[in-house]
């Protein structure tokens, strides 16, 4: 795993003029390597992590994925597959309730099929962009209210699934602390650790990484359950 990450950094990032050192002076300006920066973006859209040459004989499997852009995005495909192949339960952690359209369609489909869906999202006051009323207003400060509106609309339209227990939406809040968790757990056997926010920006614009843990024997499930309970201590369940 570490060798794959190091090889990717050395091959795709450090070798590029568009990734200058910032511990030397004078610092390069973007205009100095604008063409190289565009080429780097093109290269990263088709880049991927190397895989182990030897077949893994352990029960626990780990794979690395990279994603950038809407087309041919490996990480997005993995995320979509985790949603679509869930047979029993899907657990999601995201700081922003603003799913891209393909994932929202998959969520609704899972609920119609009677699958269990749990979503843990931060309260608007735990959002990175939240500005308390005492601070000057800015456009970026409106985002938490937008996400809150999208969340309440979703809860309202899916109320019957909330009432029958198939959908659990939890709002996290702990004093003035912020919430920036992200991750996916499918059927208690597949877990995605990622910086992907499950929002349109991460889906189509940002470069994102993900580590997919495949654990058919549920060897790490106890630790994941313990972590989930710690998180839910600061949550309230939305009822619509």
Residue ranges and their predicted role:
Residues 1-43:
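Extended, H/D-rich, highly charged conserved domains that either
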Residues 25-61, 125-127, 191-209, 218:
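Repeat-unit-sized solenoid/scaffold elements
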Residues 39-125:
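PLD-like (HKD) phosphodiesterase/transphosphatidyltransferase domain
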Residues 1, 86-89, 96-240:
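PLD/PLD-like phosphodiesterase catalytic module centered on the HKD motif
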